[in-house]
Structures are given as C-alpha cells and as structure tokens.
Amino acid sequence: MAKRSKAYEAAVAKIEADKVYAPIEAITLAKDTNPSKFDATVEVAFRLGVDPRKADQMVRGTVNLPHGTGKTARVLVFATGDKAEAAIAAGADFVGSDDLIEKIAAGWTDFDAAVATPDLMGKVGRLGKVLGPRNLMPNPKTGTVTPDVTKAVNDIKGGKIDFRVDKHSNLHFIIGKVSFDVNKLAENYAAALEEVLRLKPSASKGRYIQKATVATTFGPGITVDPNVTKVLVDA
C-alpha cells in the first residue's frame, strides 16, 4: 500500500473516525482537509441498498446542479443537417455522424457527455460496448436522445449530470470545486440527494441509502448522515 503524504495524514487527523457528520459540517470539513494545492473536485458517493444486477433495482437518472460542477463538460452530438448546425451554435464540442461513430468505434472517448438525434440511434446503438461502460451512451430517459439538441447541450453545459449505480451499488457525483462557497456545495449536494431519493426503486427493501461520503479529489472520505435530507446552509 502506498504511503500517504504528510498533508493527507494531517487531514485525516482532523476527522473523527466514527462520527457521522451533518452535510454542511462534512462539506466544510472536506474543504478544510483538502491536501492538494490545486482547486480539487468535491465529490459525494452514495452506497445504495439495491442489487444493480436486477433491472427493477437499477438507479439511473439526471440532476441539474444549481451551481454546476465547476467544470465545463465536453459535449459530443450525433446529428446531421439543421440539427448539427443547432448543436454547433449551442456550443457542442464535437458534432457529426458517421465520422464520429467510426472514431468512437476505434476507441476514442475524449468527451464527457453524448447527445443523439433519434434518427441516428440505429447507428449509435452499435457503440454500446464502447459507450455503455463509460456511461456515455445517449438515452431518452436522461434527455440525451432528443430532437432538441440545443436544450440538451445547454443543460449539460449548465451543470446537468447523468448518473447510474455501478456494479458495487455505488453512485458517484461531482458537486463542485474546493473554491466553491460552502453553501453552493451544500445546495448541489442537496439536489443530488433529493434526486437519488426520488428514484428509489419500489423493489428496494430495507435501508435505501446505506452510506454517504464526501471527499475532495485526493482527500480523506468524510461520512455524511444520509437521513438529513434538508441541508441547512450557513447564514
């Protein structure tokens, strides 16, 4: 196991190992214990009481973070004609059809989100083995298979993120940067938590959110009380 840096060990020392923190406390502590000199990402992870191998327990959706993630997403749009022009005008980073499909089929995935017009999904669907594992496959349930490419690009650029529970029953969200005000991070956290709770599968029995953790990119995890659904921000 790699030896932790002195900065990391100092950060860990500020955290009470067995304490479950209120969200605002955890976020404040995450900022305070960030061991990196750069503007690190603040992330939250939820461990869910679901079995993602079962279709009726899959948790997948989108959330519009009120303050964005602090990162401008690179958006790819599969479109032609007027829709392609609209995507370019909206600020999409990559726009095309057959050319992009061939490039991705060869292994290229240097983008953060993908949108497709419905007429191209027959071709785009063949990229499932490349895009699926990376959660990049356009999906009508997340608003990324749509004729309204302008809205889709604007939503993603504005802080809309897709999420899907992984095979270990975990969900991961970026809720901002260390440079964000604590209140903005707390409001982003609250938006993510609210959507996860809304999407609880009826087939999920017992405790739904089993654990919640907040951490910076290279910082220690801080356990958050998932039962606190209303995040009180600092005045």
UniProtKB/Swiss-Prot annotation:
GO terms for biological process: regulation of translation; translation. Keywords: Repressor, Ribonucleoprotein, Ribosomal protein, RNA-binding, rRNA-binding, Translation regulation, tRNA-binding. GO terms for molecular function: rRNA binding; structural constituent of ribosome; tRNA binding. The keyword Transferase does not apply. Pfam families: Ribosomal_L1 (PF00687). InterPro entries: Ribosom_uL1_bac-type, Ribosomal_uL1, Ribosomal_uL1-like, Ribosomal_uL1/biogenesis, Ribosomal_uL1_3-a/b-sand, Ribosomal_uL1_CS. GO terms for cellular component: large ribosomal subunit. Binds directly to 23S rRNA. The L1 stalk is quite mobile in the ribosome, and is involved in E site tRNA release. Belongs to the universal ribosomal protein uL1 family. Part of the 50S ribosomal subunit. PANTHER family: 54S RIBOSOMAL PROTEIN L1, MITOCHONDRIAL, LARGE RIBOSOMAL SUBUNIT PROTEIN UL1M. This is Large ribosomal subunit protein uL1. It comes from Paenarthrobacter aurescens (strain TC1).
